[in-house]
Design a protein with these regions (language model features):
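A broad, low-specificity signal for short, low-complexity segments enriched in glycine/proline
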Residues: 13-16, 37-40, 47-52, 105-110, ...
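Glycine-rich, phosphate-binding/catalytic loops in enzymes
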Residues: 26-30, 69, 105-107, 162-166, ...
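Catalytic domains that recognize anionic headgroups
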Residues: 4-12, 16-18, 109, 115, ...
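Structured beta-strand-rich core segments of catalytic domains in phosphoester-bond hydrolases
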Residues: 9-101, 207-210
Length: 240
């Protein structure tokens, strides 16, 4: 998929970094797809975390939030591009991890419902706190920003409204259809993944690309920055 679409930047919100001897999954992926600049941020080298690949050099990074015991985190990478410096956010808000409940064979469906509701009550406050932390941090940057985000939250939630109130949802400008990116509980189609931009960015396209490489669809966006004649593309699929 990456070779087919050939984006300038790729953001993975959930990447399994396997390191065995000389083999490193992110290094291998970057080399096979032609990205000279890449990074992984996770709890340890064998676990899930954020991964990032770019055709442009990374000159600085800013950690938006991170947990010692969760894979969810956010990081802003500052790239040196032909249009000047551009910030690319790779953000993964706290997960509900419903699969842990869905996969339990010892429970009837009616017994699972209270567990789902309890999980929702526990996770939403954490998501709200994450958004409240990252918005003022991102607003400090007076440069083009593109934010690849797995929010684990649907449109019209408090978390989405907070982000959409400060940044532009590219789906609303150039998306088509309903923009579904995830099958919740295996059957309910929802939009959990977004690309947001600030007012320094012109949105050219927003496309949702389904594939069998992940349980989330990828989003491919094309953007133009002030002073640049070249379009930049961003593709943030989740990956395991």
């Amino acid at each position: 998929l990456i070779n087919e679409q050939d984006p300038d930047v790729v953001c993975f919100q959930e990447f399994r970094r396997s390191v065995r001897g000389a083999y490193d999954a992110i290094e291998y992926t970057a080399e096979r797809t032609g990205y000279p600049h890449y990074m992984f941020q996770g709890r340890d080298k064998h676990k899930h975390g954020l991964a990032f690949m770019s055709k442009y050099p990374v000159v600085d990074t800013d950690t938006l939030f991170v947990y010692p015991h969760y894979i969810n985190q956010g990081i802003l990478s500052i790239l040196e591009t032909p249009a000047g410096r551009v910030g690319v956010g790779n953000i993964h808000l706290s997960s509900f991890q419903f699969d842990e409940i869905t996969s339990r064979k010892d429970l009837e469906p009616k017994e699972k419902l209270p567990l789902y509701l309890k999980r929702i009550r526990n996770v939403i406050p954490r998501q709200e706190a994450e958004v409240e932390r990252i918005v003022p941090m991102l607003k400090k940057y007076d440069m083009p920003l593109v934010l690849a985000t797995d929010m684990n939250a649907m449109p019209h939630t408090k978390m989405y409204n907070r982000m959409a109130g400060q940044f532009r949802d590219t789906f609303k400008e150039k998306g088509r259809g309903l923009g579904w990116t995830f099958h919740l509980l295996g059957f309910l189609k929802v939009r959990l993944d977004y690309e947001f931009v600030n007012d320094h960015v012109e949105v050219l396209t927003h496309n949702v690309i389904e594939s069998n490489h992940s349980d989330h669809a990828a989003i491919l966006g094309h953007y133009k920055f002030p002073g640049s004649q070249k379009q930049a593309t961003l593709d943030p699929p989740n990956s395991e």
